[in-house]
From Swiss-Prot:
SUPFAM superfamilies reported in the protein's UniProt record: Metallo-dependent hydrolases (SSF51556)
An example molecular function term from Gene Ontology annotations: zinc ion binding
Active site per database record: D248
Known role: Catalyzes the reversible cyclization of carbamoyl aspartate to dihydroorotate.
Name of protein: Dihydroorotase
Covalent S-S links between cysteines: none
Needed cofactors: Zn(2+)
GO biological-process terms attached to the record: 'de novo' pyrimidine nucleobase biosynthetic process; 'de novo' UMP biosynthetic process
Broad enzyme group: hydrolase
Length: 348
């Protein structure tokens, strides 16, 4: 087995960069590995129109490391009031690539999200007309629904209906966490795809809960049981172009995670491709990593694959205990642990 792995440079089709003083840190981490990234719009206030998307894009570009060509692909945050005109303006901008459906209350900064999917059917119809993907956080949010069942219920109550009603709409079922979602995407038409995170390939709920609660494993959708983890590994390593890389890297300051009511999100951008390599290696499927990380996403979005490459080397290194995060610190996933693959820096 080779100790070096060279891939076409990957893209991240789902990431949270946050805003303000933390941008130089989060943008620097993603730009180290990825050429492009789909930027989540759940700021406070959210990115609801092309003007706000353009302003956020400029802040991200200004935070890039010197010499970086990293390209942020902006996303519109859908609300009950998003109009077809908002969608058409976003498409015409040339820098907004998708629109995001957050069910209200589903995750961090989603309070402005959609209260009923029926409210945004005119906007979804416009998305289908202009060829812009709908990105879906697929969880129901009613309090009586068990947190481990919310993804499956969303499929049954909403996803099937949306896919059937808008047969030409490109839909990305984001950060899928269940065998139900993997099966749904596999059986759906070619215009339905899904992203999968590194943490959902490497871990299950036992890692978060057994022997004590580990807040840095807590994300939404929440880690599920091992059988779902296995199904996600099957999907990611299958070579099926419907499945592609989306880290959902979502930083929170240490005090916001290590709290009585901690925030949801795992910070993986600093070593994401290294973690994916571990997951694929566990399945003896490193030959499938380039498709998942570098080819399937661009093909789904109708974009060219990158032409430059990255190289991973099989070399143990210890992840940092913490990383700078503006004036605070963030504890990354795998903090203080050994990783088996290392990205070979260009000047190394």
């Amino acid at each position: 087995m080779s100790d070096r792995l060279t891939l076409l440079r990957p893209d991240d089709w789902h990431i949270h960069l946050r805003d303000g003083a933390v941008l130089p840190h989060t943008v620097g981490d993603v730009a180290r590995t990825f050429a492009r990234a789909i930027i989540m719009p759940n700021l406070v206030p959210p990115v609801r129109n092309v003007t706000e998307a353009g302003a956020y894009r400029e802040r991200i570009l200004a935070a890039r490391p010197a010499g970086s060509r990293f390209e942020p692909l902006m996303v519109l945050y859908l609300t009950d009031r998003t109009s077809p005109e908002d969608v058409r303006a976003a498409k015409a901008s040339g820098f907004v690539y998708a629109a995001k459906l957050y069910p209200a209350g589903a995750t961090t900064n989603s309070d402005s999200g959609v209260t009923s999917i029926d409210n945004i059917f005119p906007a979804i119809e416009a998305l289908a007309e202009v060829g812009m993907p709908l990105l879906v956080h697929g969880e129901v949010t009613r309090s009586e629904i068990d947190v481990f069942d919310r993804e499956k219920r969303f499929i049954d109550e909403h996803m099937r209906r949306v896919v059937e009603r808008f047969p030409t709409l490109k839909v990305v079922f984001e950060h899928i966490t269940t065998s139900d979602a993997a099966q749904f995407v596999t059986e759906a038409p070619a215009n339905v795809g899904a992203t999968i995170t590194a943490q959902h390939l490497l871990y299950n709920r036992n890692h978060m809960l057994v022997g004590g609660i580990r807040p840095h494993f807590y994300c939404l959708p929440i880690l599920k049981r091992n059988t779902h983890q296995v199904a996600l590994l099957d999907a990611a390593t299958s070579g099926n172009p419907k499945f592609f890389l989306g880290t959902d890297s979502a930083p929170h300051a240490r005090h916001a995670k290590e709290a009585a009511c901690g925030c949801a999100g795992c910070y993986t951008a600093y070593a994401a491709i290294e973690m994916y390599a571990e997951a694929f290696e566990q399945r003896n499927a490193l030959d499938k990593l380039e498709g998942f990380a570098s080819l399937h996403g661009p093909a789904f979005y109708g974009l060219p694959a990158n032409t430059d490459t990255i190289t991973l080397v099989r070399e143990e290194w210890t992840a940092p205990e913490s990383l700078p995060f503006g004036e605070q610190t963030v504890v990354p996933l795998r903090a203080g642990e050994k990783l088996r693959w290392r990205l070979l820096e260009k000047n190394a």
